[in-house]
Amino acid sequence: MAKLLHLSCSPRPDSESSAGARVFLDGFRQMRPDWDIDVMDLWRERMPEFAGPIVEAKYARMKAEAFDDAQRDSFAEAERMATRLSLAERVLISTPMWNFGIPYKLKQWFDIIVQPGLTFRYDPASGYLPLLKDRPTLVILASGSDFVTGMNRGRTDMATPYLREALRFIGISDVRFVPIGPTTGPADPILAARETAYRRLREIATWF
């Protein structure tokens, strides 16, 4: 069965990014009712802290050294999470922007799955090479203010370039972003931004 992996990155089920994901998935399910939607809620998912054995496992792997038992167990968790990504034909990431970047749980997910031999490899002649096949990926990114006309005009959106580059590093370059913002302040701009995003999400769902 074809699969879409949804990385749900907000701790609030009624958040703007979560609501946008529901709009998209409603349309996606109508177009592809036979697809499996694998939801990975990063605030409820069992994820190892990127410390201790899993860090040592990463460096052992890079040096082609054998794992000890603790490293083997930790690396198995990274394999489990990376496999869920590699088995998905489509990826949806719904996330808020926090302090111009991404939530720490999403960064933790990247830190865990970006492992040598799992999602990238190193070649002395060519440098770092991705191991995942490219696949359509949609990022719904909600922010309190927009970065064109709102309070954050002129400030740097660090979430979008980070996500684009982190995904490209492991092989995923077919990435589209749908921003939702502003999500705070006067009601009219919020409603207008929401409707613009929802309209685009419904359209993307017809062909994604």
Swiss-Prot record:
<keyword id="KW-0285">Flavoprotein</keyword>
<dbReference type="GO" id="GO:0016655">
    <property type="term" value="F:oxidoreductase activity, acting on NAD(P)H, quinone or similar compound as acceptor"/>
</dbReference>
<dbReference type="Pfam" id="PF02525">
    <property type="entry name" value="Flavodoxin_2"/>
</dbReference>
<dbReference type="InterPro" id="IPR029039">
    <property type="entry name" value="Flavoprotein-like_sf"/>
</dbReference>
<keyword id="KW-0520">NAD</keyword>
<comment type="function">
    <text>Also exhibits azoreductase activity. Catalyzes the reductive cleavage of the azo bond in aromatic azo compounds to the corresponding amines.</text>
</comment>
<dbReference type="GO" id="GO:0016652">
    <property type="term" value="F:oxidoreductase activity, acting on NAD(P)H as acceptor"/>
</dbReference>
<feature type="binding site">
    <location>
        <begin position="97"/>
        <end position="100"/>
    </location>
    <ligand>
        <name>FMN</name>
    </ligand>
</feature>
<dbReference type="InterPro" id="IPR050104">
    <property type="entry name" value="FMN-dep_NADH:Q_OxRdtase_AzoR1"/>
</dbReference>
<keyword id="KW-0288">FMN</keyword>
<dbReference type="InterPro" id="IPR023048">
    <property type="entry name" value="NADH:quinone_OxRdtase_FMN_depd"/>
</dbReference>
<dbReference type="GO" id="GO:0009055">
    <property type="term" value="F:electron transfer activity"/>
</dbReference>
<feature type="binding site">
    <location>
        <begin position="15"/>
        <end position="17"/>
    </location>
    <ligand>
        <name>FMN</name>
    </ligand>
</feature>
<comment type="function">
    <text>Quinone reductase that provides resistance to thiol-specific stress caused by electrophilic quinones.</text>
</comment>
<comment type="subunit">
    <text>Homodimer.</text>
</comment>
<dbReference type="InterPro" id="IPR003680">
    <property type="entry name" value="Flavodoxin_fold"/>
</dbReference>
<feature type="binding site">
    <location>
        <position position="10"/>
    </location>
    <ligand>
        <name>FMN</name>
    </ligand>
</feature>
<keyword id="KW-0560">Oxidoreductase</keyword>
<protein>
    <recommendedName>
        <fullName>FMN-dependent NADH:quinone oxidoreductase 1</fullName>
        <ecNumber>1.6.5.-</ecNumber>
        <ecNumber>1.7.1.17</ecNumber>
    </recommendedName>
</protein>
<comment type="similarity">
    <text>Belongs to the azoreductase type 1 family.</text>
</comment>
<dbReference type="GO" id="GO:0010181">
    <property type="term" value="F:FMN binding"/>
</dbReference>
